Every structure is written in C-alpha cells, then in structure tokens.
Amino acid sequence: MLYRLINLCVATLLLSGSTPGQIAPGASQIPAELTPVGHWRTFDDVTGKVTSIVVIREENGKLGGEIEKLVDPDPADHNPRCLRCEGDAKGKPLIGLRILWNLRRDTDQWTGGRILDPDNGKVYRCDITLEDRGRRLRVRGFIGFSVLGRTQYWLRVE
C-alpha cells in the first residue's frame, strides 16, 4: 500500500512538471514583495456601493489600516463620527479612524489582527488574504473561530 502511495506522489510530481519542494505550475503563491500595503476601496454589504477608501500601512512588522476617505458621505453630517464605538474610538471622526491593526504575515495571508466595524462599533478578530495578483483583498472578520464570521472583498485603488 505504501509503495502505491509513493508511486502516486511521484507520478503527480512528474505530471505537474514540478520537482519536490517546488510549487506546481498554476498554483497560487503570493510573491514575497506583494503585500496589502496601499489604498483599498471598501463596499457596503447590502448595496455593493463603494463606501470608503482605507489605507493599509506596515507598522513595526505588522499591518494596520485607517479610513482615509468616505465616499458619498451624508451631506448633512460634515464630520461623521463613530458613535457606536467603545473605548478610545468612541466619538472619534471616521476619517482617520484606525479600523485594522496587529496583522502579522503568515505564509500567504496576514493573521491575528483585529478589525473595527464602525457601523456597529464592534471589534472582531481578522485575517486578510491577497487575491487576483494583489488586486483584491479578502477580509475575514470573526468571533472566536474563522467559520463564525463574514467576509468582505476590498479592491485595490490603482
């Protein structure tokens, strides 16, 4: 049985054109220099419209992000604030509000971070992953385990 398994592994490597230790052609691997650092469009979960531009920066080897611009803000509210936030973020202006922090690189994703949802003021655990050659960011916010959460996709501003 073990002999058959070894033969199957060797045949798979030969057919893929890879040698042991290589990534098979077409496999997803993010280049080391490609990171989420930059500007991202965020979207409303219900309408699908762009809501803000978030800038992600590297801070002491970790990633963090803040709202840089609101898209189509309420014209009656000239300085929207995070009214549902708690702690240091309570009542702070949305523009400049830190909504991502403490993300550390783990192979092809950034994990262990936190994300603030300014709509409800809650902080969630967060993992992010680059997709589509760095043009799309998968943002997963969750409580406890990653399966208990929701995913948003942000698009890189080019």
Q: Which residues does each predicted region cover?
A:
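Bacterial N-terminal signal peptides
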Residues: 7-17
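Edge beta-strand at a domain terminus
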Residues: 25, 134-136, 142-158
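N-terminal helix-cap/turn-to-beta initiation motif at the start of protein domains
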Residues: 25-38
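Short polar/acidic secondary-structure junctions
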Residues: 32, 45-47, 118, 129-131, ...
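Central antiparallel beta-sheet cores of small beta-barrel/beta-sandwich binding domains
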Residues: 42-126
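Short aromatic-glycine motifs in intrinsically disordered, low-complexity regions
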Residues: 85-91, 138-145
